[in-house]
Amino acid sequence: MSEYQYNKVTPEMIEKFKEIAPKRVLVGDEINEDFTHDEMAIYGKARPEVLVEATSTEEVAAVVKLCNENKIPVTPSGARTGLVGGAVSIGGGVMISLTKMNKILGYDKENFVVKIQSGVLLNDLAQDAEKQGLLYPPDPGEKFATVGGNVATNAGGMRAVKYGCTRDYVRAMTVVLPTGEIVKLGATVSKTSSGYSLLNLMIGSEGTLGIITELTLKVIPAPKSVISLIIPYENLEDCIATVPQFFMHHLAPQALEFMEKEVVMDTEKFLGKQVYPKELEGTEIGAYLLATFDGNSEEQLEDIIEQASEVVLEAGAIDVLVADTPALKKDAWAVRGALLEAIEADTVLLDECDVVVPTNKIAEFLTYTKSLEAEADFRVKSFGHAGDGNLHIYTCSNDMEEGEFKKQVAVFMDKVYAKATEFGGMISGEHGIGHGKMDYLAESLGPVQMRIMEGVKEVFDPNMILNPGKICYKL
């Protein structure tokens, strides 16, 4: 049990919230069921006492200040696409939704930055930047997450292999601290050596240290040419073993994804389209790499395609299929983008992990993971970012009793996380810890690092009101 005691929201406080955010305060059963859980419902449901739909930094600050003074838990909420229970108000209290803070505030093209409110959807920012001839490189699979949520988990996505993760594109932010104070961290400039980086501490903190309300993000000139390759293999081992060759030959893929045939077939059925071949010249396909390259000209990409084709065919690929039309490229990536959605649609009980391991350990790690499937009553499906070792592994069942499913999954996850740690990996590459992975984080990092994290949390949030029960602070 927590040593911190929280209070219930009173009618008087509700009236004050309504003064702060007129007609945007919901109470009790007025709050939609969607606000009780995120996309991974296996981590439980909890309804906040009050939901406030904020439209400005000042509103967020006023609500948080009132909650801090009265020791009321506060849970920040974006598009609720998380997978670890990070936006579930397990402590009750007040939930602050940031989805109405969805304005793109403007571009500074001379300094290649864009300023936005944190509730802007990733898809909206990507499309708007494209109209400006710019690219916002972070490209997580869930395009309808908020950018603030991406920052809160340091999401990576498909283009991380070349361009890095969300952290690499955050120049500055406006944050409401747990006390209700408003601070601006970072600056438009590209480098700094100015004391502790509170900006970087906030990135990946999952709403436990502050609520991000505005962001200044780095953008880059959009590449002039982009092309994708579908590369089929007879088996997953050969597929993954090819990955280091891309980097040894300086091919610099913009994205490099692996997918198992079963997962691809299920997704194509879900989407009602067939894109990926299942057999070529009598050879059954078992897995695929989906690679994208970008450059300044079509001629440059033609050279890259020729070299990449030689490399992968020599390494065991069955063939190389060029997605040489916009429609085929769109369809190929639509399948990749819908993998999780298809798994969710066909699964009653679902859990996941997104471990990250050194790239030279991917094949061995996935082979080990698949070997564990024989010991369980659930199915194991996987896909992920082959280029940086971030693997998405899902346990799926349609006929197990929930208690037994959770019991078996716990055994499976214990082994998976232990192996990832043994290989020099980490337990989460981009989905975060939330409250679903706290025990695994503690076991992976050990008591010294956890004690430091707890100390950081206490400095920012003395009353422990902000997103309690997540990362390092248990309820």
Swiss-Prot record:
Identify one Pfam family in the record: FAD_binding_4
Q: Which residues form the FAD-binding PCMH-type domain?
A: 43-222
Q: Does the keyword rRNA-binding apply?
A: no
Q: What class of enzyme is it?
A: oxidoreductase
Question: What Enzyme Commission number(s) apply to this enzyme?
Answer: 1.1.99.6
This protein's cofactor list reads: FAD; Zn(2+)
Which regions span the lipid bilayer? Answer: none
- Record family assignment: Belongs to the FAD-binding oxidoreductase/transferase type 4 family.
What functional role does this protein have? Catalyzes the dehydrogenation of (R)-lactate (D-lactate) to pyruvate. Active in vitro with the artificial electron acceptor 2,6-dichlorophenolindophenol (DCPIP), but not with NAD, NADP, or cytochrome c. Also displays a very low oxidase activity in vitro on D-lactate and L-lactate with O2 as the electron acceptor, but this activity is most likely not physiological.
| Protein name, UniProt field | D-lactate dehydrogenase
Q: Which organism is it from?
A: Anaerostipes hadrus
